[in-house]
Amino acid sequence: MRLKRALLWSFVLATPMALPQIAVAESAVDMEEVIVTSRRKNESVQDVPLSVTVFGEEKIKQLKPATLRDFDGLAPNVYIGMNAAGPGNSTIYIRGVGYPGSEKTQSPQVAVIVDDVQMGSSTGALIDVFDVESIEINRGPQGVLFGRNTIGGNIVVNRVKPKFNEFGVNAAVSVGDYSARTIKARINIPLIDDTLALKIGAISREQDGFWDNATIGGEQGDIDFASQTIALRWAPNDDFDAILTYDRIDDNSEITPQDSLHDGDNRFVTFADKETPTSYEVDQLSLRMNWDINENMTLTSITASNSGEDDTESDFDGVFIGSTNFPIVQLHPKRPQEFDYFSQELRLAGAITDTLDFMVGYSYFDSELDYVQFTNNIIQLPAAFLGLPAGVPCAAVPGLGLRANPVIGDAFCQFPNDKSTQFAGEDVESTAFFGSLTWRPTEDLEFLAGVRRIDEEKDGRNRYVNHSTGTFDAPGQDPHDFTGAPQVPGTSYTVSDDWQDTITTASANWAFADNARAYVSYSEGFRSGGFSIRSVNAATAPYEPEEAEQIEIGLKSNWLEGALTFNLAYYQLEREGGQFISIITLPAGAIPGTNTIVNNGGTAESDGWELETAWNINENFSMLFNAGTIDVDNGAFTLPCDVIDGCGADPSGTIRNLGGGSDSRQPDKSYSMTLAYTRQVGPGILSANTGYKKVGDFLLVNTGAGPNNRLFEGDYGLWDAQIGYDLELKSGDRLNFSLYGKNLSDTEYKEQALFLGGPNAGFQGWGAPRIWAFEVTYSR
């Protein structure tokens, strides 16, 4: 690693010597300056010494995204997908680092930050982007300035602020495929000139599901989402500005059906034998205050409180009871949860001298989670596994209460329903002190150094109750109604631990020409340790923090008199104690059917290149192009089966060698390109754009329970397009008409998959098919 860093420094020093010799051609179309907040202050994206992609309000309008998920692949080495285990659940990876799960007790590796408030978990992170003025995707560890759980990077969302002295309306109505209908509105109301303004917004989005259920009939995957926001902005003088925001979210969408890994070729036909309703209700209150103490110093306070509950019913087996899947042929959990988050951050930033800036801060985070899971599962095994000769019925096995598979017969034997309730929870308290210094010895040279001290404590609790009766449920029986069932106490434990860490960052940034600068940066990240909430015993619950360090070199440049930007970066990332999930099937009769543990794997090293270009070709045409590569080596680690009562069919004492090779969602290459066209036509402006993104082969899932628990996804490409007409009315108001389509080639691709303790049981989730929509937008 040291040799590689030495080579990187040599590259940085050598690069500027060649670049100024490149001729700069003329162009009539300048590139508009883009402002980012990647270092907790407003700066031009071309001046920031790190890899960041930013989408401004106009670009967001052009892309026609519904949620954050629609930004998948639009920045180098960035994957944004869904997770079907919960409402609005995100699976976000940057540079091959991310979290594929859904538990609120295991922190994501990529943080989503909305108006300076970090979301507490991946639930609900695929936010609607109607009321958004910019989205910044920062790649690489961001731990010093943004805190824990940002070792892959972060996505910073800045929403539209209330405006003084200006009444405004922005509303959109759209209809589309699968009975899609969306209504969005935002109103800005000035209350007191230059002092008080109010913003009110609301969203309603509905759509029928893409999936037909061949077992129970009907459609699945419906969308039913609503949200409201109210923001009050107060500025009593030129030195103080405060925004108080209230948000309410009600999401009653169905999760994406858990389609079996073995269901056949039609990706939108599922054989699951259970509906999968969800509910997600959240109330959030935040207060952001800025006080310019003097012309050289600003104090910022961000306070946020988030309280909510969600409930998800799943069919994790993805099949009907007569399937050949084993060892699990039925796994039906219901997971109601209640959660509360509170966070407070204080930052003091300013200038010590004309060449020396500083920032110091304090961060506090507190959360409480109460979790209940009702589980109803059936274990199924081939009769041969039980030693039954051909022709001998399953019921002949004494003392187990077996029955034959209802469809296939005695070739597969099923154990009676295992029923359980789990009561669990976790309390978290995390504090941090951080600071940075920025020194500019000359106008063209800048150095930054920063440090963060993290102190975190977690308390976990878990208790199981067994409701099994040794019998099978009657057809049509509610799988989660345990009224009158036995109440046999199972495993019960409490756990507690704390962790401390100090992480650092440093960068050097050199504007070696009027149109170009080179930089080198070093950054570290910290991902919280904790306790697996789905662990069945105290021995397998704990896992340690994950740490990351990265070195990056980059070039940022403007050409053709500002019409072309060309940015190039190379990074090396090393992770210690990477957290990998293993799902282990438990023996028949053991509740809740599976044991989920979090392993701290070996060292994982990766490196890659990233290219970003934007070119205003002329007054009418523009182009965006980005590309990324990932070369990764994940160290192997072992899973001692004796501490988890055996790994499925393996006896206690078995040691499984896991890890090595690729982890999930680490394609070796990916790229995207967007072409846009605008022209005055009649009284309005005609616009059109088309985009294509390509993803290379990658490992979609590795559940860490054995070499067969891997599923690879082949390379695929997605094509989107949009055409619109923008008309200014006599009143000065504007109307925009837009027709757009996504995945126009109807490409088949998987967004997620999960093995349930073995290669013959598990589910997969497919990406959306080709869809179109027509939207009308009014603004004044």
PLM regions: where:
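Gram-negative outer-membrane beta-barrel transporters
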Residues: 358-359, 443-447, 567, 572-574, ...
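Transmembrane beta-barrel wall of Gram-negative outer-membrane proteins
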Residues: 168, 175-207, 211-254, 280-287, ...
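N-terminal periplasmic accessory domains that precede
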Residues: 68, 91-93, 113, 137, ...
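Membrane-embedded beta-barrel scaffold of Gram-negative outer-membrane proteins
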Residues: 288-316, 511-527, 542-638
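Structural signature of Gram-negative outer-membrane beta-barrels, strongest in the C-terminal barrel
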Residues: 233-237, 348-351, 363-365, 424-574
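Solvent-exposed loop segments that connect transmembrane elements
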Residues: 211-219, 256-273, 315-334, 374-423, ...
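Short acidic/polar hinge/loop motifs at secondary-structure boundaries
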Residues: 102-103, 110, 115-141
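Conserved C-terminal beta-signal and adjacent last beta-strands/turns
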Residues: 336-361, 367, 551, 661-780
